[in-house]
Amino acid sequence: MKPLILASGSPRRKQLLEQMNVPFTVCKSTIDETFDPTFPPDEVVQQLARQKAQDVAKKHEDSFILAADTIVVFQGRILGKPATEQEARQMLSQLSDQSHEVLTGVALLHQGQVETFVETTEVRFWPLTDTEIETYLQTGEPFDKAGAYGIQGLGAYLVKELKGDYYNVVGLPLSRTVRALKVHGFSTRF
């Protein structure tokens, strides 16, 4: 079996794979993650995941590469990671008492062949007060996460309802990813 490389610097994706006893190493992709906002969100996440995998494969040609990209989509608009506190505040205000989608594109690459899929989860926030938003901003948690929140941390307080894969919102649709790895011969707990 070829070694598995996670093409991500995300500590959350690393923790999720470790949780499932999947043997892997990490090699962070260095691609420019800007995208054309006119593209459909599912194409954006698949393309970014594919580009990350291809970037890492240049250094690890014989390895099996796993890459992912997660975005939040609100009213047809992609919300990435906020660049400023004001942007994070605006995102959280928009998401207050509303539903949005979290999409993760996953790419599995080996010997030039790429398989991709997209997982979508619907999330609804509670109505948030300005004080709740400001308190959450002060934690620093919103700034490295798409949509300005982390469901696995203090951001769980914001979430009223979830339809779909919880782990997808964290950053990697775990069951579907591990099942895909298993199809390719990777050892898992199952």
Swiss-Prot record:
Required cofactor names: a divalent metal cation
Domain of life: Bacteria
Keyword Ribonucleoprotein: no
Family stated for the protein in its record: Belongs to the Maf family. YhdE subfamily.
Catalytic reactions on record: dTTP + H2O = dTMP + diphosphate + H(+); UTP + H2O = UMP + diphosphate + H(+)
Site (Important for substrate specificity): R12, T70, Q152
Biological process (GO), any one: nucleotide metabolic process
Protein name: dTTP/UTP pyrophosphatase
HAMAP family per the UniProt record, alphabetical: Maf
Any GO molecular function: UTP diphosphatase activity
Cell compartments where the protein resides: Cytoplasm
A cellular-component GO term for this protein: cytoplasm
Entry-linked SUPFAM superfamilies: ITPase-like (SSF52972)
